[in-house]
Amino acid sequence: LDVLHNIEPVNGLMIKAGVSMHWRKLANYDHLRLRDFLQQAGGGILHNLSIRTEYNSFAPRLRVEWTPGMYYYMNGRRKMNVGSSMPTFILDYERGLKGVFGSNDEHERVEFDVQQKIKLNRIRTLGYRAGFGIFTKMDNVYFVDFANFKRSNIPEGWNDEIGGTFQLLDRHWYNSSRRYWRGHVAYESPFILL
């Protein structure tokens, strides 16, 4: 559940604030199979691994998006953003609070992203997106929702989080990394094979 409110104090600067809440349970959890697997894995890190059966999180969130040189028009009293020839810079901060609404997760996440779609002519576009993220505080979180590992390559916009795919990560750890880098480049053209 994401509850966000946004405001645009000046042209091109969007500030979004809200909370993100997740309730997740491990499907088909079998204590014996998991224990046997960990025993067979032997010593080292996997021997001491504690996998939770529930991930409940409550996280206040702040997102700042800035697009310099944003063009817009007014539709009555409503401002309609059209686009810009400059890239959009995004800074996203989230902090999970343990004990609020039954959350058992405490984390802190910071992400930075730059994205732009460049019109080459009337029907061709070149888009790019580059960013990185870091968990500055982790409590067995391991990127459980795969949010940062999918490609969103939708012609309507880069911000469509429904489309795309995600890459499967190592089956033992999901992703225990504290940071990630990502980059996408897309060239869109009709009749590209003709």
Pin down the residues of each PLM region.
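Transmembrane beta-strand segments of outer-membrane beta-barrel domains in Gram-negative
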Residues: 1-120
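C-terminal outer-membrane beta-barrel translocator/porin domains of Gram-negative envelope proteins
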Residues: 1, 50, 92-193
